[in-house]
Structures are given as structure tokens and as C-alpha cells.
Amino acid sequence: KKQVTFADIAAYTHFSKTTISRYFNHPDSLTLENQEKISQALDTLGYKKNKLAKVLANGKSEFIGIIIPNLYLHYYSEMLTQLLSSYSDYHYKFLIFSSEHEAEEEQQYIEELLSYQIEGLIVLSHTLSSKQLSSYQIPIVAIEREAEYVSSVTTDNYMGALQATTLLIRDKCDILIHINVNVEKTVPAYDRIRAFKETCEEYQVPYDIDLSVIGNSYQEILNEIRRIFTRIEEKYPNQKKGIFLANDTYANMFLNLIFQKYRELPSFYEIIGFDNSPIASEAILPITTVGQQIDIIAQTAMELLVQQMEEQKKRSPKPLEKPVHKQITPILIRRNTTS
């Protein structure tokens, strides 16, 4: 069947092709009566939108790029799910790359995305600095990463870690242990380490911070968590141990190791994760966690990005004078791994 063209619609409605073009690109410039006539003609003629033609005509692809570090940490997979679900609200499509540690590779990914004329970019990876990202001259929103030069959305990591640490202290743990990576101080998640340390010192409780969790795969991280578990078992026998882990993936791994050894969660262990990703509630024992409101973070990131993209479409766009930074309050969710 022959594809219906603007010329066909113009001939059927007795409007000019310019008027038909205005209907698609600037419908408010037409009267409601003329909009209705054209709409009925589209139904009668069986018109199907040609997205490619629209991109070629106005240079707007309706694509947003996403760069995400990995999908084996449940936080990132849940964040991606929430971002993709925004299609029903904004009708933007997504092009997604996974990038971790390799700056040159990530720059290639961004160049590839730009070649598809993306209208905006959401970045969760930590590879390139925000100063480098800002040089690309497109709307960008960073999520939970260093973002001095671009707009961002983060969780109040300090408050979340404070809530977790305070709960372990109230539950009368003899030793508090925080397991994390060696996070740079410019990264929002560093506040989890800072809040844990400062809270332990304020309440004068013994604490231990292990920043050695590294790995580029699930198996590498599991091996490192196993090593840490063995060290804790040997170093703190006969003590009630309160373990606060950097995320729910680590917490679930640690919990599984405890179950492998004890067939239960003994009274001398308490565990708190961070994120409230699905694995926290799906674990062998539902895990107490600091809930990042991932749905709200994703929604806020999309709102910030769409505002910038819509501004870019104006005849005289006014770019942001300075980046906008939004912080979302976390919620401590008590489950079965604390008293």
C-alpha cells in the first residue's frame, strides 16, 4: 500500500502543504476547526507517522542517551527500568551504553550517541569528569555521581548512612563495620562513609571501615566479599556485629555467606544495605536497607533533562546560568536483618 504523503493530505483537505506541515510541527498556529479537519483526513487516508522523515526535517531525533556503569549492581538495573518507564510520560526513546573505567571507550560511546542526534544525555558512570561532559554542549543530567559542571540528582547519602548507623548503635552492636569501595570525596556516595565514621565517633562506639571491595564483575565482587566475611569472622568472634554495606547487592552476597555457614542469620549479626533495589526484598531473608527513592530520582532526572531539551528547541534558547542540583531524601526500610 502506497504511503500517504503531505501532498495527499493537502489534496484531500484542500489546504496547502505548508498548512499540513504546520499541523504536525506547530498545531497551535491553526484554528481548532482546521486541526479537526486535518485529523479526520489522517484517519480516513490511513496516515502513518514517518519518524525518520521528521528527524531529517527538523533535526530532532526524540532520542536520549544513557551511560550506565553496569547491570550486575541491582541499583543500576532498577534505575534503568525506571528511566525507561518514563516513555509513557515524555515519549522519548533511549539509546543505552554500559561503560566502566575506560575513559576513551566512554568518549567513543558519547560520539556514537551524538551521531544519532540525541537530544539529551543521562550519565550514571563515573569515568569522565563533569567538566569533560559539559564540553559536549547538549543537555546533560548526572545521577549519583560527581556533577560540579552539569545538573544532577542525588540521594542525601549522609542522612541515609546516619539512619543506618544509628539503628545499629540502638540495636547494641558491639562493633560496627562499613563495607564499601574507596570512593572519591567528590562523589555523593562518599557521604555514606563520612556519616558512618562521624556517627560512630560521636556515639563513641568501636567501628571498622573496609574500603577494599573492588571488581568489574559479579564474581570478582563476590570473591572480595567472601574474603571480607572471613576476616570479620576471625577478627571479631563472640561480638555482635553490625554490618552496613554500600549497596543491596553487597548486602545480599554477605547475607548468603552467613547462611552458607550458619544456615540462619545468627543473633550476633545485623545487616543493612543501601538502595532498596529489588534484591533487598527478594533475598533469602528480606534485608533492612536505606531506600533510595529510585522512582523519584529517575522522574526528577527526566524532568530536569526535558526542561533543558525543551528550552533548546526555542528560537532564542536561554541555557541554564548554572547547573541545577536536586537531592532526594532516603527512607530507612526495616526488614528481617536487624532487630
Indicate residue ranges for each PLM-predicted region.
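Extreme N-terminal segment that seeds HTH/winged-HTH DNA-binding domains in transcriptional regulators
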Residues: K1-F15
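Central regulatory/effector-binding core of bacterial HTH transcription factors
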Residues: S85-S130
